[in-house]
Amino acid sequence: MYGRLREIDEAIAAGREALEALEDAADSLDSAKRWGIVDILGGGLITSVIKHSRLGDANHALADARVALARFSAELDDVRGVAGLTAEVNRWNAFFDIACDNWLADIFVQKEMSDAADRVDEAIETVKRAVRRLEGARRA
């Protein structure tokens, strides 16, 4: 009984660690999207650089999340589908966005950021559900 509880506690801890990293990524993506809107409205080169910096922050957080999700998935099969998350923007679009700094490039990058944010939000919900089930199993 105590061994099972310990395993559940370890899985819950891994899930919470993954959630924290995913939420950090979501925050960075939200920041990048806000900078993206400013960029679309004529923010300029500095705005593009800040936006891509926030995307880099999101990718670092997602790398941390992948490690935590791998640990979590060793305990729980439900999260295997979210292990390949990334907030990468197509390199050509990133170059085009910074070098040309026009509204068309800004819109392409904004769409990629929104898609990445949607995937991260789905992963957060998947992990939250799994953690809630584990917490329920622990109480049972």
Question: Where does each model-flagged region fall?
Answer:
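A composition-biased, non-transmembrane "mature-region" signal
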Residues: 1-140
